C-alpha cells in the first residue's frame, strides 16, 4: 500500500495535527508529483496533461493534490473542515413484530382495530435493531461495515448520517460528531450523507447534466482559480466522470429499469459520482459497489481512500463480497451479527482477533469474507479442539468482544475523543465558520444549503429546461389536447346569437370554459409523485430545498400555461361570439389564466400534502366534484342547501364563473326571441299582454336585461366582478404557500423494512438448525449438505448443447450504427458451469438477451444452434433466464410464484400434482422452506435481497428448463455467504446435468474457482478469452502470461488480475490488443474447430433420433410457443390477478371511497330536489356530475395496469409463460366483480338521496325503474374500466394515456346532450352526439329518473302578464292546448302566473330523451364495452407485441 495510505492507517488521534498534516502533504505532493503539473491549475490544465479530465493521461491523485494546494493558497477560500464521529451505547429500535399478516380486502379492517388499540394506550412490541454499539472513526479514516443482510449495516449507516425515519435511536445513545451533536441532523445535514443502495435519478436527464447539477448545487461562494461557478461545476463534473470511468456516457440519458439508458453498472457509478460531488466530510455508503465489477469496486474504494488522505474525508462503507484489495484500503472495520457488535478496530488486526478465538481462515478467502463468515454457523470453521470454547450465538460473540482488551482500548480512545471534542465547544464554532464561508451571502447561517434560495431556484429552472428538452411529449400532448378541446367547444357553440335564446348556452359555455381552464392541470399530480423520491434524495444531500424545485417548476410551467391560455381562449372566445369588446375579451383571458394558476396550486398542494397517490385520489375526486358542482351553474346559488352553501365560498372556480358571467351579461340588453303567449290567435296581442319566455322578463319589454337575468337565475351581483379576482389571487397565493411549505416538510411514504409477511392464518416455519447448535469444524460443507440431494432426482437432466458463432449485435444511436457485440463465439454444455465476465458495459447482459431471444430492438447476426439446429419458437420457454432485477408480483407468496411458473411453463403432459410436488422439491433445494408461504412484497418490504434472488432462480428451476439456464448477476448485491450458497446450488445443478451460463461481478478467488469455463468480454463486446479456467485458474493464467501479461501473484484474485491485465480496470493500461491476440491464438482455432464438429455431430444425431423415434418437425406439443394451452393460461392468470386485487386493499378501498364518497356528495348536494324547471335541470346535472367520475376512475386503473404490464413484458412474456391475450383479458375481467359491487354502492348512495325514486311512485314502477337505474350505473363503470384498458394498451406512460383519455372523455361529455341539446348542435357535430356513449347513459338515466311525473314551477320561474280580457284560463287556453304548461290560477283576471312546463316528459323531449328507449340505451352501452375490449386487444397487439425477429445471415 502507498505511503499516504499508511499515513491514513496510523493517523494521529489529534484532529488539529491531522489537518496540519493534510496541509503539509498537499504542499509536498505538489512539489513531488510524478506528473509534471508545474505552473498549471486544475481549471487551466494543458490538454492531455495529468490534470486534464478529458485527456487519456488524467491522474485523479495529481488533480486532488493540485486542487488542494490551490485551495490552500487562496486566502479567500473557505477553511477546510473535517468530521469524525464517536459513538457509544448506540441502541436503535423499532416497533411492531418480526412477522405481520398480509392485508387483504377481507381483513384490512383488523388494522383499524389495531390502530385504535394503539391510540388508546396499548403498547407496541419493541424490536431491537442495533444493540450497544461503540466505535470511533476519526477525520480522514475509512470504516468498512461488514455483516450479512439483516444484521443492521444499513441502519447503522443511516443512524450516523441522521436518516432515522422508520426507527428510533435510544435517547441514552451518545453520538459525537467532533464536538457537534444535535446540529448535524438539520443545520449540517449535507455534511454527513447516506447513499442508498438504490439508484434514483431523472431517467430522461443525461449523465452530464445530472452531475453538473449536483456540482453546481454545492459550488462554494468563492472559487479558487479565478473561474466562475459554471466553469467550476463543468470542470468538477468532468473530473468526477473521469475518476469513475463514465466520461463516455456524458450525453447518454441515465435511464432506469424501464427506460433504456446507461448500463446498470454505469448507473451505479453515476449515483456514486453524484454523492461525491456533495463534498460531504462524512460519507456513508450502503453497498454502493452492487452491480460493479471487481475493478470498479476497487477503484471506488481507492477514490475514497484518496479523498480521505488528501481532503480528510471520513467514509463509512458497507460492502458485500469485498475484494481483498478493496478491504485493504480501509483503516477500521465494524462487524455486526444480528445487530450486535462483535468487533470494532483496525482492519489489520481483525482477522487475528478471530483466529486467536479459535477459528480458521480457509486458503484464498478474503479477510472480509472471513469476518462475515463469523456470523453464520454454516460458514465459520473452527480449529480442532476449540469446538466447545468458541462463541456460538450473537450474544456470546458480543459478550466475548465486551470482555476483550481491544474493546477496553477502544473505550479509552472514545473517552479521550469526547474529552477533546466537547459538545457545542470550540470546534463547533470553527465548523460553522467554515460552512458560512462556503455559503452564498444571501443564505441563512443555520441553513444546511450552500446556494441561496434564489440560486437554487435558478439552478432547478436550468434542470427543468433540460428535462423539458429531453422529453417534451407530455407538454406538447397537453397543449395539443387543450387546443382541440377548445376548437370542439367553440364549434359546438359557434356564433351564438346575442338574444335570449342563447342564455342557457352562454352559461353552459362559460361553465365548461372555466372547468377546462381550471381542471386541465390535474395530471400534474402524477408528475409530482414520479419525481418525489429524487427530490427528497437531493434534499438529504442538501443540494436544494424541495420547495426551490417546486417553485422553479411553477415558473417552468408558466410559458406553457400562458401559451395554452392564449391559444385555447382566443379560439373559444371569438368563434362562439362572446361579448365583442376589448375589455371583456382581455378580462376573460386574464380570469381564465389566473384560474389555471390557482387550480394548478390546488392540485400541487393536494399532492404535496399526501404521501402517496393512492391516498389522495378518492379525496381529490370528491373535491373536484365539489369544485365543479358549486361553481353556481350546475346548482344555482338559490338551490344550494344550507349545510353546503359554504363550499361555494371556498371554491375559487365559483368566483371565476361569477366574474365571467358578469363580464358577459353586465349592462347588456338581449332582444327577446320567444314570447308567451304566441302563435295562432295571439298575433295581434300587444307587448303589455305577453312576456318574454325567460327568467326575469318584464311585460311590455322586448328585451331582457343581463343584470336582472344573472341576479334572478344565479343571484350574481355586478359589483363582485373585480372583488372575485382579488379572492382568486388570494387563493392562488395561499395554495401556493401551502404547496411550497408542504413540499419541504412532508415526505413520501417509505418502505416498512424487510420483515417477512404471511397471509393471515399462515405462520413462519422455524429454522431447522439454529445458531445455538454446537459448532462443527466443517464450515461450508454444512451448506453443501443442506442443499444436497433433496429433490435433485426430480431436476430435469439435460442433453442438448447450445452453441453460437460470430454473434454480433448492432443498434442505431442517432444516425450512427453502434456495435454492442462483436463476433462472439461459444457454447454451453450439460454439466458445465460457464462464467460470463467483463467490465461494466462490455455487453454481458446484452449477450444473454441475444442468446435467449429476448432483444426487442437492434440487428442480430451470427449463428445460434441447439443440437446443430436453429432455435425454434419454443426456445424461450425451454430455457430458464434468471434476470439481474428480481422482478416478482409483490402480492404473491413464494410458493404461489413457483407454482405459477411450474403450472404454465412445464409441459402440458405433466400431471398437475407432479408439478406441485416438483415445486415443493425446488423449495427444499433452495432452502426456502422457512419462508415458502411468505409474501414477496416490493423491494424494501417483505423478502430481503438474498431471498428474492433465491426466488428468482427458483422460478426458473420450477419451469424445468429442457435446454439450459441463463443467470444474470445471480450474486449481485449479496454477501459472500449467500453468494457461496448460490454457487453451491449452481454446482449441484451442474452435477445433475444442468447447462448453465452465468454472468458474475466481483467474484472472490474462491468463488471464481467454482466455474468450469470462462467467456471473457472487453469493452465493445469483443471476446478476450473463451475456454477452461483450470485448477487454481492455471489454464486461464497461463494463456494471458503466454501472450504478454505479467505473472499473477500467488495471493492475487485471478478474476481481478485479468481485468488489470487487459486494461479494463480504471487507471490500468495495456499495449496489447487482446481481442486480436485471441483471434490469432491456437485456442481460438480450437474453438472454431469444435464449433464445426458440434454443429455436424449434433445435427446428425438429432436427425437420426427424429427418424428412429418417428418424431416430426410438426410436433405441436414440442415446438409450440407456450407450454400450456390458452384456456389453462387464462385460468391461472385470472386466478393470480383476482388474488392480487384481493390482496391490494388500498386499491379497492380507494375505488370504494371514490365511488361511495362521490355518490354521497352528489346525492346529498341535490337532496330531494323538487321537480321545478331548475330542479329538473339540477337532477340532469346530478347525472352529469356523476359521469365526471370517469376521469378519476381511469386514473386509478391506469397506473395499476402499467405496473402489471411492466412485470409481464420484462419477465413473463420473454419467458413465454403465457400469452398477451391471457394477460390482457384477465386484467379486464378482474374489474367486473368489483365494478358490479361499486355499482350497487354508488346506486344506493346517489339514487335515493337525490330522491329520483319519488318520480316513479305515480306510475307504481319504483322497483323496475330502480333496477334499470342500477343497470345503467353498472354499464357506466364497466365502460370506464374497459375504456381505461383501451387507452393505456398502447402507451408507455399513464400520463400520455391520461391526456388522450381526458380528451375523449371531454368529447363524450360535450356531446352527450346536456350542455348543448341535439337541436342546438351544428349539423356537422350531430354524428358525435350519436357516437358518444354518454349520450345513451344520460338519456337512459335521465328518462328512468324523472319520466312520467308532473312539474311544479318555482316562484321565479312563473311568467307573469295580464290577459287582454276575461280570465287567465280563457286567455291562455289555446296556447296551453298546443304547447302545454299550466296556470297557477286559471280564474285570475290579472297578473297571470304561467308555468311553461307541466310534465317532465316535455323536459325530456327537449333533450331528446325518452323512457321508451331505456333498453335500447342499455344494449348500446354493451356495444361500447365490447368495442373497448376489442380495441384494447387490437392496439396492444399492434403496438406492443414483438414481431418474430430472425437473426440475419452470418455477417463479417
Swiss-Prot record:
| Gene3D superfamilies per record | P-loop containing nucleotide triphosphate hydrolases (3.40.50.300)
Print the keywords alphabetically: ATP-binding, Glycoprotein, Membrane, Nucleotide-binding, Repeat, Transmembrane, Transmembrane helix, Transport
Query: Which residues hold ATP?
Result: 838-845
Per the record, its GO cellular-component terms are: membrane
Q: Which residues are glycosylated?
A: 2, 10, 228, 287, 311, 1350, 1365, 1391
- This protein's major location comes to membrane
Phenotype upon knockout is: Does not lead to growth defects or changes in developmental patterns and does not affect sensitivity to itraconazole, amphotericin B, voriconazole, posaconazole, ravuconazole, or echinocandins.
Using the UniProt annotation, give all residue ranges assigned to the region (Disordered).
1-20
Q: Which GO terms describe its molecular function?
A: ABC-type transporter activity; ATP binding; ATP hydrolysis activity
Classification via CDD domains:
ABCG_PDR_domain1 (cd03233), ABCG_PDR_domain2 (cd03232)
The residue range of the signal peptide is none
The record ties this protein, via Pfam families, to: ABC2_membrane, ABC_tran, ABC_trans_N, PDR_CDR
- Name the SUPFAM superfamilies on file: P-loop containing nucleoside triphosphate hydrolases
What the protein does comes down to:
ABC transporter that seems not to be involved in the efflux of toxic substances, at least not the classical compounds such as itraconazole, amphotericin B, voriconazole, posaconazole, ravuconazole, or echinocandins.
Q: Give the family from UniProt.
A: Belongs to the ABC transporter superfamily. ABCG family. PDR (TC 3.A.1.205) subfamily.
This chain's protein is named ABC multidrug transporter A
Species whose genome carries this gene: Aspergillus fumigatus (Neosartorya fumigata)
